[in-house]
């Protein structure tokens, strides 16, 4: 086993929140970030690539420059709108230009419609752990999707705030077609144009106004479907789904 010596250099250059109107919760946030690794060995260790929302490289020599903007504004008493764009240019990544986030959200009270790629933390899991998740985790790039969700717990009427629910349903598309085609060796299968589906339902039982303990649990499902399967080196698909 080769000994890996690796050093991490990362700077958070700018993190600015600009309130454009003191009377309204309008917020615009700009971020600029630069990071890099330098060392010897075959691969970068997992603890330098985990919990990065996929913005990392397995190469021991790599770097990136990242810039983003996010804007949130109310439309009226019940509706609000938010959007964000987060781009990166990288060295020794799988791509030299990365659209990390590009999304628009429309919210009505507790219901939210999200379109695009957006970083999200896993449910019911400590996001600071590097072990990932059984279904999804923050070790992978955000998947472009249309997502209808109740992102925060909502008290169910008639339960006196003892039962709360949240959940989502989403459909999207994977964006690794070029990587699949380039990475797969001749004679082996790969699939492109793969679609994505996920849904979840979580419940919280408890009322801290009357009892200090709460119980939380739920179900979550993610699936791949559709797509066309090819054999590397051949032009025609072997399975057209």
Give the positions of each predicted feature.
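Bacterial Sec-dependent N-terminal signal peptides
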Residues: 1-26
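Transmembrane beta-strand segments of Gram-negative outer membrane beta-barrel proteins
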Residues: 23-65, 75-85, 167-171
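Short loop/turn motifs that connect adjacent beta-strands in outer-membrane beta-barrel proteins
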Residues: 23-28, 71-82, 94, 107-111, ...
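Transmembrane beta-barrel strands of outer-membrane/channel proteins
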Residues: 28-41, 83-89, 106, 113-119, ...
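Outer-membrane beta-barrel translocator domains and adjoining extracellular loop/strand segments
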Residues: 42-49, 94-98, 125-132, 177-186, ...
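Extracellular loop and loop/strand-boundary signature of outer-membrane beta-barrel proteins
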Residues: 50-56, 86-90, 131-136, 184-189
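Residues that define the transmembrane beta-barrel architecture of outer-membrane proteins
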Residues: 58-65, 96-100, 140-149, 193-199
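Signature for the C-terminal beta-barrel architecture of outer-membrane proteins
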Residues: 149-241
